[in-house]
Regions:
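Conserved N-terminal segment of class I S-adenosyl-L-methionine
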Residues: 1-86, 90-92, 104-107, 170-172, ...
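S-adenosyl-L-methionine-dependent methyltransferase catalytic module, highlighting the catalytic core
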Residues: 13, 76, 90, 101-112, ...
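Residues lining the SAM
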Residues: 94-97
Length: 224
């Protein structure tokens, strides 16, 4: 039951929706915090490929054991030749581009890695996050000193279209699972004497935006 609920959270929802138990190839851009192990536990048939600046960012041998390959690289350098083109069914970029001064170009360079019919999911703090109160664990965009650029759906949807993508959904992230869990998470932390974290309130207050798009053509506009 718990694993099913986890599949309904934003990071995993569209993997569950489009692939379920079927095999698929995933390029996880930002593969720290044991993301590989968490993903493979929910989707055993997934072929997991990860990218991160530092392979040791909250990863261990159990994570690397379930990866097909890990690419340790600085995304801002735009050097992605080592990653095969037309190889992936899904690219996941969850809270990555706000840390990159050229996040738009990173997206543009990664789109060729998708198969035709493949999907990309991008999530990031929206403009509204700059107006939310400051809080431990980040509730305001500027709470995190590594945030360098604010993106919007108005910028990303046309960008993706120019790369041969069609947007399926976009807007403010409002996860029903997290919304329902908010009061319980707050009470649980208070009882345990722990600090409340800003990310507990992201869905309630509209901190994050997302874009889900599907590849229908290559970057020249010709079906690949």
């Amino acid at each position: 039951m718990l694993n099913f609920i986890r599949k309904l959270t934003p990071k995993f929802y569209y993997l569950h929706k489009y692939f379920g138990k079927k095999p698929f190839t995933l390029l996880d851009v930002g593969a720290g915090n044991h993301s590989a192990s968490k993903t493979k536990k929910l989707f055993p048939a997934c072929l997991y490929y990860g990218i991160d600046l530092d392979k040791n960012f909250n990863n261990d041998e159990s994570d690397f054991a379930v990866m097909e390959q890990f690419y340790e690289m600085d995304l801002t350098r735009l050097e992605f030749d080592v990653i095969p083109d037309h190889a992936f069914d899904f690219i996941r970029m969850t809270h990555i581009i706000e840390h990159l001064h050229n996040g738009d170009e990173v997206i543009r360079k990664l789109i060729p890695k998708l198969k035709t019919g493949g999907y990309i999911y991008i999530e990031y703090p929206g403009q509204k996050s700059t107006r939310l109160p400051s809080m431990y664990g980040t509730l305001n965009f500027y709470d995190d000193p590594t945030h360098v650029r604010i993106f919007s759906t108005k910028e990303l949807v046309p960008l993706l279209k120019s790369c041969g993508m069609i947007t399926i959904r976009s807007g403010t992230r409002r996860s029903l699972v997290f919304l329902l869990a908010t009061p319980f998470r707050v009470i649980f932390n208070v009882i345990r004497g722990k600090k409340l974290r800003g990310n507990m309130f992201w869905d309630l207050l509209g901190f994050a935006e997302f874009v889900l798009a599907q590849k229908v053509a290559d970057k020249q506009g010709v079906a690949s």
